[in-house]
Amino acid sequence: MQGTWMVLLALILGTFGELAMALQCYTCANPVSASNCVTTTHCHINETMCKTTLYSLEIVFPFLGDSTVTKSCASKCEPSDVDGIGQTRPVSCCNSDLCNVDGAPSLGSPGGLLLALALFLLLGVLL
C-alpha cells in the first residue's frame, strides 16, 4: 500500500512540478489598456522572462492616462535603455511570477513553494 502512495505522489509531483516551477506572467497579445491586461499564463519552461512593451507613452504624459501595452512570456528579453528618451515602444523585462503587473519588476508569488509544501505535508499525513 505504501508503494502505491509513493507512485501516486511521484505522478502528482511530476505533473504539477513543472507548473509549480514554471514562470507566471500577465499576457495580452494585442495592445490593450494596462489595467485590462489581467490574464495570467504559465510560461513554457524555456520562457524565463516576462516582457512588457509600452505602446502609448505619449498619451499618458503627464501620467494622467492609462498606458497601452502588450505583455508576454519570453525566452529572451532585451529591456530598453533607461536613458532612451523618446523611444516609441519601451520594453521592460523581469523574471519572477507576475512581475509584469505594471511593466516594472515587483515581488513574485510564492505559489509553487506553497504547492510543494502542501504535497509534502499530505505525504507525511498519509504515511
Curated annotation (Swiss-Prot):
Signal peptide region: 1-22
Gene that this polypeptide is encoded by: Lypd2
Lipid linkage positions (GPI-anchor amidated serine): S106
Propeptide feature: residues: 107-127
Annotated glycan sites: N46
SMART domains from the UniProt entry: LU (SM00134)
Recorded topology in the membrane: Lipid-anchor; GPI-anchor
GO cellular component: plasma membrane; side of membrane
Cellular localization per UniProt: Cell membrane
Protein name as catalogued: Ly6/PLAUR domain-containing protein 2
InterPro entries xrefs: Ly-6/neurotoxin-like_GPI-ap, LY6_UPA_recep-like, Snake_toxin-like_sf, Toxin/TOLIP
Domain annotation UPAR/Ly6: ranges: 25-100
Record keywords: Cell membrane, Glycoprotein, GPI-anchor, Lipoprotein, Membrane, Signal
